Amino acid sequence: TNVVGTTNVLEASKNAKVKKFIYAASSSCYGLAQTPTDEKHVISTEYPYALTKYMGELATMHWSKIYKLPAISIRIFNAYGPRVRTTGLYGAVFGVFLKQKLANKPLTVVGDGKQTRDFLYVTDVAKAFLLAAKSKKKNEIYNLGASKPQSINRLAKIIGGEIIYIPKRPAEPDCTWANIKKIKRHLKWKPIVPFEYG
């Protein structure tokens, strides 16, 4: 779906002459990245979700360059908030913890929990997409995160409850950390919601 669905929407957007196409890409395309990670970092997709999301981004940039569809790709780091995904192999840790907490089950921390993630609240994500849509920028790629990594152990402590540790998955990064200088400069965007309040 990430690839076929995206190309279908790109083609429909081209035919409808939409003013701007914003693609929700994923920071997972960076794999085990050097941090903080900027948009020029080498791509290293380590699992199927990352690969298909990156293929969707490639398609978006292709339509932008070849068919002149004004498009921007935003590589979202670790978004969280209401209606966050709670299931699936690559479900966001925040959503998984929340589901476990509501079911009175222990929180399952992958690895030792010292790994960090660049969590960004969903309203900050929405604001970035709105600014991108209204901007004159096109054929650009932006990282989107808070640029303040938080440990999984800290997240588990904030949510509260019993914690059990499970083995680390292959290709699991120790840290995700967005360099957001480009999006700040181009779109005048900045994160607002502190981690503790989200």
Language-model features: locations:
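Catalytic helix-loop patch of NAD(P)-dependent Rossmann-fold dehydrogenases
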Residues: 1-11, 15, 19-20, 28-73, ...
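Conserved mid-core alpha-helix of short-chain dehydrogenase/reductase
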Residues: 8-11, 59, 119, 124-127, ...
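Conserved SDR Rossmann-fold cofactor-binding beta-strand/turn motif
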Residues: 25-26, 75-80
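Glycine/proline-rich active-site loop of Rossmann-fold NAD(P)-dependent oxidoreductases
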Residues: 54, 79-95, 103-105, 110, ...
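C-terminal "lid/loop" region of Rossmann-like NAD(P)-dependent oxidoreductases
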Residues: 112, 141-142, 150-181
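Hydrophobic "lid"/C-terminal helical patch
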Residues: 129-133, 156-159, 180, 195
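C-terminal amphipathic/interface module of NAD(P)-dependent oxidoreductases
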Residues: 179-198
